[in-house]
């Protein structure tokens, strides 16, 4: 083994360990570049990081340096931190990241750890402050409040107990009582209840009432923000005192307080006693046992026994004593308060560069409280220094690096860093060249060379096996320095021996470092061990020694002790290279002689011994000078004992690091023995205070211990203050400094008054402050002069105090430099000047800068008065004159200067009156005035007083307005509008008031009313109407003349706007106004407001009045009705309430209607049960009976809709007894027993049991089971002439029923004829077979005969007698009903029975007659057909209006009469009835045609209706007569006579009010058009009138041309033939030319023109199937001979010029003939009305006589929204797709027969005409698209949500106009959803149908019977159908309603825009449209489109339509 090499390896290992321990101290010593620096923290993590496991946390650490430092996170023990997957990560930017984690993943070593951030670069390392990381796992916790026991009258403290695991994160935020009292922290401290800063609830002076409350605390988690109430409620247990008791303190519960600075804290003193004790708090003076009372102020308060400190400061820290006393005893408790201040540290200087060997000093400057430890680190390693100042006496290379100062306490830490750089140039030694290991033979010489470099130049030394080599005869060391500065060293060994072998080392060393090199020199030879010197080592250290072996080769090296080879214990380690290591050396076990033995392979060995001496270092025992501080003059001593350590020991003492010399400064040092030193101080003084240190030293080491000696030193002056004098205005400073221990507190006080004695604290202000005992007074003034006391107190002795006088030397001063003084003219005046300052002071007076000498004017007198503060001088003036208005100046002078003051003397008088009063502006309530300012009397005008009054009042009854004197304009407010006022003004100054100005008169303007209508009452009239009544506002608030009222209403609790109606003012004094609001929703709350208006505007809205309409009946039945059979006589019925919106009221009860199903038709047999719950049990029912049940809800309005019938059957039960029993003798041994079934079988009869028993003997009863279908039993084997008793029972599955009556029979030879069957009633169904039994017995065999209705029966094809005697009737008919009797007869006897046969057949047509009519009801009388035999269950009454759909009503069979109510007034109706029974519905009666009473409105006389003024016209609508039908509304339009366009004024004027048309021009002719509406129609009236002139006069009538008669016209023409003939001829030529051109063009485009234009063709009309897309290409192209459709924005209608074709005898292109005969109405297809005789249809009929087939022009006309001549406008595809057009399905085509027109007998085919379209201004989504119930049609009905009363007529009006299309046809109702243009809304049939002639002739009849705005809808407006896609809007038009014209044609210009707007549709709340009588399946839009395509392209369908005369319906081009 190569021993030298091994030893070299181990030495290198130890060197590496040493290098690691030294950190980075072997870095290059070259001074860094200027921009290079060590690390410095930019962002240091905070001391504590608390986070929730649900949020996680990121800790950021940033540092700067050059090069950029590396960030490493370490634990508190210095080990590096790594990633823990999912729990802890270190991001690339140096952040320590804790992701959110689950509770079960919590790890304490990760989540509850102290971390630090380490930043390092090549210049050093720094470590951040400690980062205490604490993750909080969200845990459920509950806070508790316990009972607290308290004696009445004492204070109580209730604690909120928070579990410890969340206590650090949860705080109390409030307290709550069960009486809803809430208390929060930070409230005032003078209340009974106080929440302390620490969270407790403090209750002072507890009384009995406090014991009744319960208390809960609310806590908040500061990490999660969660708040919660305590789980328990605490109470106070209040004890009544029985006897006196001393105070008792429970101090164990409360811990010392630690609070952050500027936070609030409470120190508790929980004591109780009786009587209630008093509390007093003291604070101990720091370091002493003395205490002083706590001074209470705004910051420190005492509440009962609790001391509350707000905004705590560090000075508040200390020990507090609470002393509690009452009349019985006392107690006290101490509490320590620690106020912490955040720690911070700073090292001065932060960077310093120090040359080698020079000292370096770092000072750690820190703040905060408390400071527990101060420590220093270098490059992240502790250096064991705990003083604030770190001093390095001689800087070495290894001292360079980063130094840190750490300050710590229990809560936090802080650090500061500084860098020490080395100055100059330092190059550590470097071995540049060295010797290598060598093996050689003995003899030759050896030369070892070592070359080293460095700066400064190193010195090289040599060692052999760790022992320095010195020169001798064989070893020579030499060295020199090369020119490069390297040192070359040689070791010469002469004649090397074997003993010279070993480990040679050269060491290059300079003051900046060491470098070394070692290598083995192996010399062949025997083993040799060089002598080893004695080794001394300190106990506890590690011994490392290497055996110095020579010789080569060496086989082994071992160590021995006491001849035992080592190791012999765990502490010893032996290495093959000869190294011995002993750890933790101890004297007793390790001090010995160790032997090293070296051997070679030949067995030669060498031995060498090493003596190891273990030295023990000294150890000093702790000592102290006592716990409390000593006083001056006391004796102090301390013993320094060193129990351990080798002798000799040196023991030294130091004070504050300075050595203590025996006998100096009062110190006595006594060496009691070798190990003890005594320190004595005979008399303590301030010098002796400090830190004492005892230092014990021996060769093994040093030990020390420090103890502090506190000496209480009373204050002594360092600088005692003396009297001072300062110039006024200067900054004064008076020093007062004292020394002592504890450090004295220096305070200043000022004497109260002018003499010393009583002093008060100086108030802190901006100019007075005390800093470190020095009093500073900035800008000192005379007020600061006086005696001051400086006091220094530290609690030792009585303290020091000094009284000084501070004088302020001031020149004279006037406190008031300038003032005004006034005097009334002629009165005396005194002017005074007071000068303050050092006396003597002289004062002179000047007047207007001229010396005033009283001698020159005896009116002036000057007097002086000496004051304590100065001099007062007075100038008296006996009588003031105008000339005395001047500037007087007094000048004061003393030795220090002078000052002056001025008095502006003003002699005053009253002002003159204002003038030039003018009115600048006026309004209804104010007037703006201006005036000229008058002479002010040499005194500023204080104010103007504006006086005003009403013109009729006197000036003693005035109002005033005060105006500032500096203005000449003002506004007088609070005037009443439209009132005359007189106004004047006066001026006023301090002297008096002027005279009044001249008055002006004004009249205020009118304003809108300011008052609200009064006494508003809203009462429901019925379910849809409410009456509103009110009275006018107070007369004073009219502000003019009230013209009317706006009454607004809306649904309550909605954000919709009010809908207003206008009511004219009633002039009668005190009369109540009223208005009925109609068409409201049932049982809906409405809000009503009213405002009055005059010509200026509307007044304020009244307060909302809310009212419900009357309750209605529920419109929907209860849902989810179900029944459950409980027993044989009970059924449970359950249901769910109807939807709330359909209840229409408050549901009070539910009614259950029930009856057996077979009696359900009979109303009289139905039973009713009321209940308030949602289920009920029906009792007392028939057993095993099927019941039918319905449920309905009932409100105050009545019964609601019944639910769909449900059925349940009761359970079976045992049957009743058979109804009757017969026993018939059949022979001498047989009897036939027959019976009738039980009347109530109560189930299905399973069998009968016949019981028989012989009479007179105790024989057992015999039984015989008989099947259920057998009604007789033959008993045989009976004894002759022996009576037998028989009875029968019936059985069901439940059991056997009751027994029948007993009957006795006796067998006999005589068998008379008897019939076993019973009389019965048989019911047969129409056309079915019937059989009636007649079972007979007898001997001889009886003869059976039958009689029908008393007539003997003879057999025929339908009737015959069966062998068993039964009568069989086949195919029963109605005539078969009646009595059937069967007769049986033999020679002995005869018998008979009678059956009744009832034939069930559908009822025949009943008789319907009209009994009575009213305006809204018809009364019909119903009578069944005489031929009905089957019971009639009831009637179905069918009725419909002329243009409506069929409606039905069920009528009870018992009702003789029936009222059809809710009909339209003055309308035609059709009525018929059908009967029904349990077979079904019967035949229909004849149709009854009738009408309700009433007519259209009737025109009034013009004078009674119109009242004209200059700018308005009043309309008295009460002058109109309603024709018997209530008026619904009026439409008012007007225009000037010379204008064409009508202007709509209102389209919804209520009939009960007057109406005023405003804003007319005076002296102008106007046309007025009034359209009056009721349900019978409308009437139009036009009036001409001229407004009056401005003065009220009339204007001359207009000049109208005289009307010309026919004769006049002919005469004019004949007299101008020379002009007429050429004109006529020219016109004829032009017309002929146009006709020829048209014919030629039509031939070239025959198909296209026919398709587009010739739509009025007759039965052969068709559409070119080759061009189905023609409409799409062209849109709509107007035919050449027709007026074009209107351009959007134009003002004329196209409908008036379009010609209409007529079918029948007229040509296909005939124009409209106004004289043509009926029917002017194109009737609608009606549902099939059954004709008498079961004729349900009519296949063909000559309809041409009555009907025509309208073509495309007829259908298109109403819309008038098409594009011009092929011009196409792209529509919104989403809207265009929503609307399709469909052809009519002809009445004759298809399997469904056509239907007659509405007013014709059934069976006549008809074609349904389309509804005219209309347009109006855009309205949002007003109409919905509907699909009809049958056919292919599109229906528009109002959207149900639309509810605009401004455009809605009454509900009945629109029901009145309903039209139906069931089986086909096109039906349009209403405009598109967005355009609602009145320009095109007149229905064609009314425009042209009844204008002239016909049954409804008269020029205005198209407004007549049906009104121009006849609404067409599929079903009643009460029940609109289901919504479907809305149609697209038509092209836009001009929205200017004022310029629009309904129509420019003469034929139809009477219809107005108002009519169109008026008829937009019923209100949305009218409900759903009813279905047609015979509905077909609804089709989707896509299905309809496919159907259209099929119809258009199908030849068969077209041919069929041609054959049947089918025309094409107009296409809805609104979708183009």
Swiss-Prot record:
**Which residue intervals define the domain Ig-like C2-type in the entry?**
39-134, 138-230, 247-338, 342-421, 428-522, 527-613, 618-712, 715-807, 812-904, 1312-1394
Q: Where is the composition biased (Polar residues)?
A: 1826-1836, 1994-2004
For the biological process aspect of GO, one term held by this record is: peripheral nervous system development
Ranges of biased composition (kind: Basic and acidic residues): 1944-1962, 1974-1993
- Record bears the keyword Zinc: no
Give Gene Ontology CC terms. Answer: axon; dendrite; extracellular region; neuron projection; neuronal cell body; perikaryon; plasma membrane
Report the record's disulfide bonds. 61-117, 160-217, 269-322, 364-405, 450-506, 547-596, 640-694, 736-790, 833-890, 1334-1382
Annotated GO MF terms? antigen binding; axon guidance receptor activity; identical protein binding
Q: Which Pfam families does the UniProt record give?
A: Dscam_C, fn3, FN3_DSCAM-DSCAML_C, I-set, Ig_3
Q: What does this protein do?
A: Cell surface receptor involved in guidance and targeting of growing nerve axons. Required during Bolwig's organ differentiation for accurate and efficient targeting of photoreceptor neuron axons to their synaptic targets in the brain via the P2 intermediate target neuron. Involved in isoneural self-avoidance during dendrite arborization but not in heteroneural recognition and repulsion during tiling by related neurons of the same class. Involved in regulating axon bifurcation and divergent extension in the developing mushroom body. Essential for axon arborisation in ellipsoid body.
Q: What is this protein called?
A: Cell adhesion molecule Dscam1
Q: What organism is listed for this UniProt entry?
A: Drosophila melanogaster
Organism classification: Eukaryota, Metazoa, Ecdysozoa, Arthropoda, Hexapoda
């Amino acid at each position: 083994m190569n021993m030298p090499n091994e030893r070299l390896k181990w030495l290198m290992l130890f060197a590496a360990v040493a290098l690691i321990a030294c950190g980075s101290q072997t870095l290059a010593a070259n001074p860094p570049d200027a921009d290079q620096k060590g690390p410095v923290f930019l962002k240091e993590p905070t001391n504590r990081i608390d986070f929730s496991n649900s949020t996680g946390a990121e800790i950021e650490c940033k540092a700067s340096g050059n090069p950029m430092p590396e960030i490493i996170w370490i634990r508190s023990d210095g080990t590096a931190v790594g990633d823990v997957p999912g729990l802890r990560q270190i991001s690339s930017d140096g952040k320590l990241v804790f992701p959110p984690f689950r509770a079960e993943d919590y790890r304490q070593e990760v989540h509850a750890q102290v971390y630090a951030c380490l930043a390092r670069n090549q210049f050093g390392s720094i470590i951040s402050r400690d980062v205490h990381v604490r993750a909080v796992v969200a845990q459920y916790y509950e806070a508790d409040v316990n009972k607290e026991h308290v004696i009445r009258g004492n204070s109580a403290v209730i604690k909120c107990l928070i579990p410890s695991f969340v206590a650090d994160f949860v705080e109390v935020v409030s307290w709550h009582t069960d009486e809803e009292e809430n208390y929060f922290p930070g409230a005032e401290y003078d209340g009974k209840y106080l929440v302390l800063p620490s969270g407790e609830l403090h209750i002072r002076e507890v009384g009995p009432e406090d014991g009744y409350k319960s208390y809960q605390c609310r806590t908040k988690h500061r990490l999660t923000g969660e708040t919660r109430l305590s789980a328990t409620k605490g109470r106070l247990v209040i004890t009544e005192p029985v006897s006196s008791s001393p105070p008792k303190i429970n101090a164990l519960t409360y811990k010392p307080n630690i609070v952050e600075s500027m936070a609030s804290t409470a120190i508790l003193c929980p004591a109780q006693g009786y009587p209630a004790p008093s509390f007093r708090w003291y604070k101990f003076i720091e370091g002493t046992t003395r205490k002083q009372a706590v001074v209470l102020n705004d910051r420190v308060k005492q509440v009962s026994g609790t001391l509350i400190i707000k905004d705590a400061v560090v000075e508040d820290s200390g020990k507090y004593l609470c002393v509690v006393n009452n009349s019985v005893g006392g107690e006290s408790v101490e509490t320590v308060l620690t106020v912490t201040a955040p720690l911070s540290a700073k090292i001065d200087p932060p960077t310093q560069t120090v040359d080698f060997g020079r000292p370096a000093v770092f000072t750690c400057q820190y703040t905060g409280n408390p400071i527990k430890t101060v420590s220093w680190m270098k490059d992240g390693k502790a250096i064991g220094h705990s003083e604030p100042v770190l001093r390095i006496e001689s800087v070495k290379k290894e001292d360079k690096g980063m130094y840190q100062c750490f300050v710590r306490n229990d809560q936090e830490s802080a650090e500061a860093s500084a860098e020490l750089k080395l100055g100059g140039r330092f190059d550590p030694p470097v071995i540049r060249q060295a010797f290598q290991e060598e093996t050689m033979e003995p003899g030759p010489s050896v030369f070892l060379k070592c070359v080293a470099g460095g700066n400064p130049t190193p010195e090289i030394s040599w060692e052999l096996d760790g022992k320095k080599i010195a020169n001798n005869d064989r070893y020579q060391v030499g060295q020199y320095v090369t020119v490069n500065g390297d040192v070359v060293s040689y070791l010469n060994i002469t004649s090397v021996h074997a003993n010279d072998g070993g480990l040679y080392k050269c060491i290059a060393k300079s003051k900046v470092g060491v470098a070394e090199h070692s290598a083995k020199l192996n010399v062949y030879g025997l083993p040799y061990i060089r002598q080893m010197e004695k080794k001394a080592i300190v106990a506890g250290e590690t011994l490392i020694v290497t055996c110095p072996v020579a010789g080569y080769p060496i086989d082994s090296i071992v160590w021995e002790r006491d001849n035992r080879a080592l190791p012999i214990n765990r502490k010893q380690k032996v290495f093959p290279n000869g190294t011995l290591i002993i750890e933790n050396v101890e004297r007793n076990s390790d001090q010995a002689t160790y032997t090293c033995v070296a051997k070679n392979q030949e067995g030669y060995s060498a031995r060498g011994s090493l003596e190891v001496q273990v030295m023990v270092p000294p150890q000093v025992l702790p000592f102290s000078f006592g716990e409390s501080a000593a006083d001056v003059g006391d004796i102090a001593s301390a013993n320094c004992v060193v129990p351990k350590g080798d002798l000799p020991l040196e023991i030294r003492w130091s004070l504050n690091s300075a050595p203590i010399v025996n006998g100096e400064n009062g110190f006595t040092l006594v060496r009691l023995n070798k190990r003890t030193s005594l320190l004595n101080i005979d008399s303590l003084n301030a010098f002796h205070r400090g830190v004492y240190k005892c230092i014990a030293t021996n060769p093994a080491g040093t030990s020390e211990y420090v103890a502090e000696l506190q000496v209480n030193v009373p204050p002594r002056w360092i600088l005692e203050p003396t009297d001072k004098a300062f110039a006024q205005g200067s900054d004064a400073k008076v020093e007062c400094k004292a020394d002592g221990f504890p450090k004295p507190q220096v305070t200043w006080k000022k004497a109260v008054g002018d003499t010393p004695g009583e002093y008060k604290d100086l108030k802190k202000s901006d100019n007075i402050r005390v800093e470190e005992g020095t009093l500073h007074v900035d800008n000192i003034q005379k007020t600061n002069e006086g005696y001051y006391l400086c006091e220094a107190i530290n609690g030792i002795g009585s303290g020091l105090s000094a009284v000084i006088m501070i004088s302020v030397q001031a020149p004279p001063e006037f406190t008031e430099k300038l003032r005004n003084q006034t005097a009334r003219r002629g009165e005396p005046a005194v002017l005074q000047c007071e000068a303050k300052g050092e006396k003597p002071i002289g004062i002179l007076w000047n007047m207007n800068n001229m010396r005033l000498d009283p001698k020159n004017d005896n009116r002036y007198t000057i007097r002086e008065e000496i004051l304590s503060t100065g001099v007062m001088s007075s100038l008296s003036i006996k009588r003031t004159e105008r000339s005395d208005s001047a500037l007087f100046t007094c000048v004061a002078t003393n030795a220090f200067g002078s000052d002056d003051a001025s008095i502006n003397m003003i002699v005053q008088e009253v002002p003159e009156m204002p003038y030039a009063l003018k009115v600048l502006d006026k309004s209804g309530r104010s007037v703006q005035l201006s005036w000229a300012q008058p002479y002010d009397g040499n005194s500023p005008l204080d104010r103007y007083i504006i006086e005003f009054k009403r013109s009729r009042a006197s000036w003693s009854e005035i109002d005033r307005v005060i105006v500032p004197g500096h203005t000449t304009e003002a506004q007088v407010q609070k005037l009443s509008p439209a009132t005359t006022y007189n106004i004047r003004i006066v001026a006023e100054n301090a002297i008096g008031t002027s005279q009044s100005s001249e008055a002006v008169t004004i009249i205020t303007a009118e304003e809108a009313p300011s008052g609200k209508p009064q006494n508003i009452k809203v009462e429901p009239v019925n379910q849809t109407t409410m009456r509103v009544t009110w009275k006018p506002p107070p007369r004073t608030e009219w502000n003019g003349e009230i013209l009317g009222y706006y009454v607004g209403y809306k649904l309550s609790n909605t954000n919709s706007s009010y809908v207003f109606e206008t009511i004219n003012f009633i002039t009668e004094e005190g009369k109540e106004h009223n208005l009925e609001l109609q068409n409201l929703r049932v049982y809906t709350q409405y809000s009503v407001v009213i405002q009055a208006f005059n010509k200026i505007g509307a007044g304020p809205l009244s307060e909302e009045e809310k009212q419900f309409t009357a309750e209605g009946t529920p419109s929907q039945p209860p849902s989810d009705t179900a029944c459950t059979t409980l027993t044989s006589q009970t059924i449970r019925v359950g249901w769910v309430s109807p939807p709330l919106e359909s209840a229409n009221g408050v549901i009070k009860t539910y009614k259950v209607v029930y009856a057996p199903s077979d009696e359900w038709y009979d109303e009289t047999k139905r039973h009713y049960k009321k209940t308030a719950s949602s289920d009920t049990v029906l009792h007392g029912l028939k057993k095993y009976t099927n019941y039918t049940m319905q449920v309905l809800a009932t409100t105050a309005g009545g019964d609601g809709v019944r639910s769909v019938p449900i059925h349940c059957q009761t359970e079976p039960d045992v049957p009743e007894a058979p109804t009757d029993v017969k026993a018939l003798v059949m022979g001498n041994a047989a009897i036939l027993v027959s019976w009738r079934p039980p009347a109530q079988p109560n189930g299905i009869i399973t069998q009968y049991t016949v019981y028989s028993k012989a009479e007179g003997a105790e024989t057992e009863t015999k039984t015989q089971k008989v099947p259920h279908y057998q009604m007789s039993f033959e008993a045989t084997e009976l004894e002759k002439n022996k009576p037998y008793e028989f009875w029968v029972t019936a059985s069901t599955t439940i059991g056997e029923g009751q027994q029948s009556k007993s009957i006795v029979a006796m067998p006999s030879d005589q068998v008379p004829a008897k019939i076993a069957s019973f009389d019965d009633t048989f019911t047969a169904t129409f056309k079915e077979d019937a059989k009636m039994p007649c079972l007979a017995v007898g001997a001889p065999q009886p003869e059976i005969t039958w009689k029908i209705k008393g007539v003997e029966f003879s057999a025929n094809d339908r009737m015959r007698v069966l062998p068993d005697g039964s009568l069989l009737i086949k195919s029963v008919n109605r005539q078969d009903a009646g009595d059937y009797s069967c007769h049986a007869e033999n020679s002995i006897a005869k018998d008979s029975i009678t059956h009744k046969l009832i034939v069930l057949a559908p009822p025949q047509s009943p008789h319907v007659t009209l009994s009575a009519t009213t305006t809204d009801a018809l009364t019909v009388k119903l009578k069944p057909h005489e031929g009905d035999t089957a019971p009639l269950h009831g009637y179905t009454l069918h009725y419909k209006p002329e243009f409506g759909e069929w409606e039905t009503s069920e009528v009870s069979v018992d009702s003789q009469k029936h009222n059809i109510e809710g009909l339209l007034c003055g309308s035609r109706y059709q009525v018929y009835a059908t009967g029904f029974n349990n077979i079904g519905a019967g035949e229909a009666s004849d149709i009854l045609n009738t009408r309700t009473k009433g007519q259209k409105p009737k025109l009034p006389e013009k004078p009674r209706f119109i009242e004209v003024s200059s700018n308005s016209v009043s309309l008295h609508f009460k002058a109109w007569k309603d024709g018997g039908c209530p008026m619904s509304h009026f439409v008012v339009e007007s225009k000037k006579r010379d204008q064409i366009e009508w202007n709509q004024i209102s389209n919804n004027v209520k009939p009960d009010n007057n109406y005023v048309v405003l804003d007319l021009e005076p002296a102008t002719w106007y046309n007025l058009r009034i359209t009056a509406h009721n349900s019978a129609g409308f009437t139009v009236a036009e009036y001409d009138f001229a407004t009056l002139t401005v003065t009220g006069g009339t204007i001359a009538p207009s000049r109208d041309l005289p009307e010309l008669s026919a004769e006049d016209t002919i005469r004019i023409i004949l007299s101008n033939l020379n002009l007429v003939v050429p004109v006529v001829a020219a016109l004829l030529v032009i017309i002929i030319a146009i006709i020829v051109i048209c014919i030629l063009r039509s031939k070239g485009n025959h198909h296209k023109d026919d398709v587009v234009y010739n739509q009025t063709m007759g039965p052969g009309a068709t559409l070119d199937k080759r061009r189905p897309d023609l409409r799409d290409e062209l849109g709509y192209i107007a035919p050449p001979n027709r007026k074009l459709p209107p351009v959007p924005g134009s003002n004329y209608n196209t409908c008036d010029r379009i010609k209409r074709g007529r079918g029948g005898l007229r040509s296909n292109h005939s124009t409209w003939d106004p004289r043509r005969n009926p029917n002017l109405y194109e009737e609608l297809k009606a549902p099939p009305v059954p004709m008498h005789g079961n004729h349900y249809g009519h296949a063909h009929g000559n309809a041409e006589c009555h009907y025509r087939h309208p073509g495309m022009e007829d259908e298109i006309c109403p819309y008038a929204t098409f594009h011009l001549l092929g011009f196409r406008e792209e529509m919104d595809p989403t809207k265009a797709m929503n609307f399709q057009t469909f052809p009519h399905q002809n009445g004759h085509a298809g399997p469904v027969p056509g239907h007659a027109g509405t007013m014709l007998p059934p069976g006549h085919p008809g074609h349904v005409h389309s509804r005219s379209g209309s347009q109006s201004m855009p309205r949002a989504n007003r109409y919905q698209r509907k699909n009809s119930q049958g056919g292919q049609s599109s229906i528009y009905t109002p959207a149900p949500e639309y509810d605009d009363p401004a455009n809605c007529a009454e509900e009945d009006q629109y029901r009145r106009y309903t039209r139906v299309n069931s089986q086909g046809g096109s039906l349009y109702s209403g405009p598109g959803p967005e355009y609602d243009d009145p320009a095109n809304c007149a229905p064609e049939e009314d425009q042209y149908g009844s204008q002239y002639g016909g049954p409804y002739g008269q020029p205005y009849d198209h407004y007549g019977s049906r009104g121009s705005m006849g609404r067409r809808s599929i079903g009643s407006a009460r029940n609109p159908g289901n919504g479907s896609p809305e149609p697209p809007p038509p092209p836009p038009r001009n929205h200017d309603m004022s310029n629009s014209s309904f129509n420019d044609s003469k034929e139809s210009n009477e219809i107005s825009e108002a009519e169109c707007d008026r008829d937009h549709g019923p209100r949305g709340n009218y409900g759903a449209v009813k279905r047609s009588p015979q509905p077909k399946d609804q089709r989707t839009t896509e299905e309809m489109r496919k159907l259209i395509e099929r119809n258009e392209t199908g030849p068969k369908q077209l041919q069929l339509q041609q054959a049947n005369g089918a025309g094409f319906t107009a296409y809805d081009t609104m979708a183009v």
